UniProtKB/Swiss-Prot annotation:
Name assigned to this protein: RNA-binding protein KhpA
One Pfam family of this chain: KH_KhpA-B
Record PANTHER family: RNA-BINDING PROTEIN KHPA (PTHR34654:SF1), UPF0109 PROTEIN SCO5592 (PTHR34654)
Coarse class of the protein's main subcellular location: cytoplasm
Entry's localization field: Cytoplasm
Alphabetical list of InterPro entries matching this protein: KH_dom-like_a/b (IPR015946), KH_sf_prok-type (IPR009019), KhpA (IPR020627)
Keyword Signal in record: no
Naturally occurring in which organism (per UniProt): Mycobacterium tuberculosis (strain ATCC 25618 / H37Rv)
Keywords in alphabetical order: Cytoplasm, RNA-binding
Purpose of the protein: A probable RNA-binding protein.
One term under GO cellular component: cytoplasm
Disulfide bonds: none
Length: 80
């Protein structure tokens, strides 16, 4: 199930951004649970987050629907 979540998020994010080759999606498992980390080109960060966080919220809703409520989605700022 986790591979399906990662593939779905990667496919959607690649469709949103201007630099699809720079998209990387990782599934991190820790004692806090599972987290899908989305790494994009710094110029595309605003597109993935969306106005008022709407796109990021939609990604989180999609992940909750596919993988259950125990998976978090983090959009990683690669500038820092």
């Amino acid at each position: 199930m986790s591979a399906v979540v990662v593939d779905a998020v990667e496919h959607l994010v690649r469709g949103i951004v201007d630099n699809p080759d720079d998209v990387r999606v990782d599934l991190i498992t820790s004692r806090r649970g599972r987290t899908v980390e989305v790494h994009v080109h710094p110029d595309d960060l605003g597109k993935v987050i969306g106005r008022g966080g709407r796109t990021a919220t939609a990604l989180r809703t999609l992940v909750a629907g596919i993988g259950g409520r125990g998976i978090r989605v983090d959009v990683v700022d690669t500038d820092q």
